[in-house]
Amino acid sequence: MNIKNILWFTLKKLSNLSLSISLLLLIASISIIGTIIEQNQSIVYYQMNYPINNQPFGRIMNWKIILNLGLDHIYLNPCFVLVLVLFFCSLLACTFSNQLPSLRNARKWKFLQYKNHINCNNHFVELDKISICNIIYSLYSNNYYIFHKENNIYAYKGLSGRIAPIVVHFSIILTFIGSLISLLGGFTAQEIIPTGEIFHIKNIIQSGFNSEIPNNITGKIKDFDIKYGPDNSVEQFVSKIIIYNNQGKNINQKQVSVNSPLILKGITFYQTDWKIDTLRFKIGNSKIIQQPIIKYKINNQILWSCRLPLNKEKYIFLVIANLNDKISIYDISNNLLTSIKLDETIVVNNTTLKIVEIMTKTGIQVKTDPGIIVTYTGFFILMLSIVISYISYSQIWVTSIIQNIKIAGSTNRATLTFEEEIINIQEIYTQYTWS
């Protein structure tokens, strides 16, 4: 078997519709797994959420299986990328070997000159009395493109409906190319920054082979705020970000929220998460003390707490429910002693206490996606092609034999509408021929 035969055999296998559908279903299945299993998390996260001793699912899916199979970064897994490449090649092969030749064949003028060819079509009408001019006018009135040769007529309309499958293939290929550009040239960084601090893009959690991390900009979190609803639930959290260049010049700033990112030269800054980091306070006449705060989840409610020593023997616990409420103070027996506001001084067990500041951190995701325009263009063309696919491709053949005109037609969809068109053509022809 020579190289030409091998290439032809490979092309034939790749252009197989069953293979394309199987690959598409495989891609969809892998994507579902990637949606169920959280991506790009730490090993500790998977150990906590997918323990081996979890019955009965621990034997089927645990953290070791997830890490060994690469399910923690499934969209970057070489096997998934290989499936995408195969699907891409299958679409290309199908487009050039099946769809384009089919379109070229559809554009040919097809005159059927023999009675058996006419009669074998889906719709057939025979009219008395011959008038080529009137039948042409009847077809033209129904928006058909008409070709006339001797005693034969070929007409069609809705050729764009035949183009739709090619456009679908092209849009999927374009979407794949956009995703590939993003995969190779994009990066994602995640930063947790205290309010008022300057940050650099350094905590890279995902990067492409050809991605470039910008080193000529720095950012600063000037302010952070949380908006609460009437029931004290978090509705929105907002960070004011200032971007500086290497010379320290302010080149952009914006109040960033969850659905309103900052975009600068193809780099997007998203608001992701937030947390209370540290509590600053004074005990008695001491200097300002900083105490880390630990996050808890109790009865589906998020709380932050820290333990403060009043002296060598006595401790109290400070509990924060949200930034708008007072800070609750408990003793070691979990009894509520009192509540305190920021900058308020109270006396607890003969010791003065003043809360100076609640220090928060905001989560900022920095991302570049160079293929996003190509991807969105592919999706737009895909939606457009779906609309185009509903256009019926209809063909009509007319031939005059002795004293009769034989009309045959076929369509790829909307059969009832096409039958109505045949009847309308017949009525117009009869009206002008017999009047």
Swiss-Prot record:
Listed InterPro entries: Cyt_c_bgen_Ccs1/CcsB/ResB, ResB-like_domain
Q: How does it sit in the membrane?
A: Multi-pass membrane protein
Keyword list (alphabetical) reads: Chloroplast, Cytochrome c-type biogenesis, Membrane, Plastid, Thylakoid, Transmembrane, Transmembrane helix
Q: Quote the Pfam families the UniProt record gives.
A: ResB
- Transmembrane intervals: 17-37, 77-97, 163-183
tRNA-binding: present as a keyword of the record? no
Instruction: From the Swiss-Prot or TrEMBL record, state where the protein is found.
Output: Plastid, Chloroplast thylakoid membrane
Listed under GO biological process in this entry are:
cytochrome complex assembly
* Superkingdom in the source lineage: Eukaryota
Which Gene Ontology terms of cellular component type are present? chloroplast thylakoid membrane
Family note: Belongs to the Ccs1/CcsB family.
- What job does the chain carry out? Required during biogenesis of c-type cytochromes (cytochrome c6 and cytochrome f) at the step of heme attachment.
**HAMAP family xref list:** CytC_Ccs1 (MF_01392)
**Whom does it interact with, and what assembly results?**
May interact with CcsA.
What name does the UniProt record give this protein?
Cytochrome c biogenesis protein Ccs1
Say which species the protein is native to.
Answer: Gracilaria tenuistipitata var. liui
